[in-house]
């Protein structure tokens, strides 16, 4: 009897064991891994949700929706004015003309002089505080709310360009004798760094013509039209990409370096302002250089004088040790590689959130810091650098700026000041097309459905010494 009972129990447990194995869920087959775009969205929900709070659902929806464009009129095309009128008849307005207003020419000089006088005083004050850290420390103790470091100042010095660069200086770089040294970037250099800030006066290039539809208008621009020699009369550009070029504050005969120039939209915008005398377009990857060259061949006529302003270079902008262009440019644009948030949630090809690209994505802040360090070394004293990304991530935005400012000060003796973008933000917000999110440094354009631009982060730094 005991043998029968033991056999029955054994048979019973055997049935349960086989039943469990037979119907066990095959996770690998029934639940496939998430796509890179889905992983990116989960990542953004986790990190950006708390950062943006109630704004995040709107920003998230904007990221997942098609972005909107501006039409940049190509004034190098022979019949751009006729096509400009066509877009005007469709209801597209001239964005910069509406911001400038009718009375700008009369008011700009008076305001410029007033702001310049304040800026000269504030610049000397900042330099004095930097050279006398004990004084700065006492001031910080008595005025903890950044009364010194975030005080209103004014426009920086309007300084004329030092002249055109020779081909030799462009090819070989300037002042490379004692600057070639290896710098280790840890990502913590910016802890405790406070960057002086001053107000900045903006004026918008008269030669730039940018068309945009009003907020919430669902019309799309037609395909760009071409003149008789095949040069398009305009091209489409994300509205956020306009701001870094405006933030440069280009002046007549400036020399401009675009450190990560491909695909070339921002360099072309700078050329259309008719202000720079030389535009050096740099990119390290041959494929991107080819893309840049095709853009120039498409939008710049062969017989145009503008084509002579461009110089194409292939240098690794992230190599601090071998970089050899020092104090060579009046303005430097640094549109660095980033996580490209909008593309990350919409496409899987080349997505940095794929498993194989994890380390590349984690290394982005260090790469960006090195590029910005080289940019600050390349700009002349009194010149400006505009840093920009198309991500919402603070670790690729404000943190990179703080780290780079600390590195150039400690390792190269370069002192910088942040230029306030308040005027630019105010003007663009008043157009009804842009929405900004407050940041400790710079300005951040965030997507929103009625006029879906960005994301785009910009920060402007001026070199004092």
UniProtKB/Swiss-Prot annotation:
Alphabetical keyword list: Methyltransferase, Mitochondrion, RNA-binding, rRNA processing, S-adenosyl-L-methionine, Transferase, Transit peptide, tRNA processing
Binding-site residues, S-adenosyl-L-methionine: 260-266, 283, 316, 335
GO molecular function: RNA binding; rRNA (cytosine-C5-)-methyltransferase activity; tRNA (cytidine-5-)-methyltransferase activity
Gene3D superfamilies reported in the protein's UniProt record: 6.20.240.40, Vaccinia Virus protein VP39
Transit peptide: 1-6
Impact when changing residue 390 to A: In mj457; viable and produces viable progeny. Reduces body length. Reduces mitochondrial tRNA and rRNA methylation state
Localization annotation: Mitochondrion
Catalysed reactions, semicolon-separated: a cytidine in rRNA + S-adenosyl-L-methionine = a 5-methylcytidine in rRNA + S-adenosyl-L-homocysteine + H(+); a cytidine in tRNA + S-adenosyl-L-methionine = a 5-methylcytidine in tRNA + S-adenosyl-L-homocysteine + H(+)
Pfam families cross-referenced by the UniProt entry: Methyltr_RsmB-F (PF01189)
Record flagged with keyword tRNA processing: yes
SUPFAM superfamilies: S-adenosyl-L-methionine-dependent methyltransferases
Residues at the active site: 390 (nucleophile)
Disulphide bond pairs: none
Annotated coiled-coil segments of the chain: none
GO cellular component assignments: mitochondrion
Function: Mitochondrial methyltransferase which methylates cytosine to 5-methylcytosine (m5C) in rRNAs and tRNAs at multiple sites. May play a role in the translation of leucine and proline codons.
Name this polypeptide is given: 5-cytosine rRNA methyltransferase nsun-4
Originating species: Caenorhabditis elegans
Gene (UniProt): nsun-4
């Amino acid at each position: 009897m005991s043998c029968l009972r033991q056999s029955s129990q054994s048979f019973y447990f055997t049935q349960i064991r086989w039943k469990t194995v037979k119907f066990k869920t095959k996770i690998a087959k029934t639940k496939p891994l998430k796509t890179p775009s889905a992983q990116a969205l989960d990542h953004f929900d986790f990190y950006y949700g708390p950062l943006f709070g109630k704004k995040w659902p709107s920003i998230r929806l904007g990221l997942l929706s098609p972005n909107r464009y501006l039409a940049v009129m190509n004034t190098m095309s022979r019949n751009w004015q006729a096509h400009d009128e066509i877009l005007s008849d469709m209801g597209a307005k001239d964005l910069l003309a509406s911001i400038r207003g009718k009375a700008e020419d009369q008011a700009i000089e008076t305001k410029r002089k007033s702001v310049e006088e304040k800026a000269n005083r504030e610049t000397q004050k900042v330099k004095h505080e930097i050279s006398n850290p004990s004084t700065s420390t006492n001031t910080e103790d008595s005025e903890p709310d950044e009364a010194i470091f975030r005080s209103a100042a004014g426009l920086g010095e309007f300084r004329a360009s030092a002249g055109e660069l020779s081909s030799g200086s462009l090819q070989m770089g300037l002042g490379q004798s004692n600057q070639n040294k290896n710098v280790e970037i840890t990502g913590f250099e910016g802890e405790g760094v406070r960057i002086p800030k001053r107000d900045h006066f903006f004026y918008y290039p008269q030669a730039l013509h940018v068309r945009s539809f009003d907020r919430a208008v669902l019309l799309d621009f037609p395909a760009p039209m071409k003149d008789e020699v095949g040069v398009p009369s305009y091209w489409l550009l994300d509205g956020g990409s306009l701001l870094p070029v405006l933030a440069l504050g280009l002046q007549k005969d400036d020399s401009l370096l675009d450190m990560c120039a491909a695909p070339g939209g921002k360099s072309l915008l700078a050329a259309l302002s008719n202000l720079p005398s030389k535009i050096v377009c740099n990119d390290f990857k041959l494929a991107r250089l080819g893309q840049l060259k095709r853009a120039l061949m498409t939008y710049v006529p062969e017989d145009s004088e503008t084509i002579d302003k461009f110089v194409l270079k292939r240098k690794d902008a992230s190599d601090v040790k071998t970089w050899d262009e020092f104090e060579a440019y009046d303005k430097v644009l640094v549109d660095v590689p980033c996580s490209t948030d909008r593309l990350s949630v919409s496409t899987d090809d080349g997505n940095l959130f794929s498993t194989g690209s994890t380390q590349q994505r984690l290394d982005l802040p260090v790469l960006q810091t090195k590029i910005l360090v080289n940019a600050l070394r390349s700009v002349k004293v009194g010149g400006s650098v505009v840093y920009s990304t198309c991500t919402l991530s603070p670790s690729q935005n404000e943190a990179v700026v703080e780290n780079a400012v600390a590195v150039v000060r400690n390792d190269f003796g370069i002192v910088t000041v942040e230029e306030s973008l308040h005027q630019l933000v105010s003007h663009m917000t008043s157009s009804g097309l842009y929405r900004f999110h407050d940041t400790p440094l710079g300005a951040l354009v965030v997507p929103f459905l009625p006029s879906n631009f960005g994301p785009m982060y910009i920060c402007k730094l001026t070199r004092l010494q």
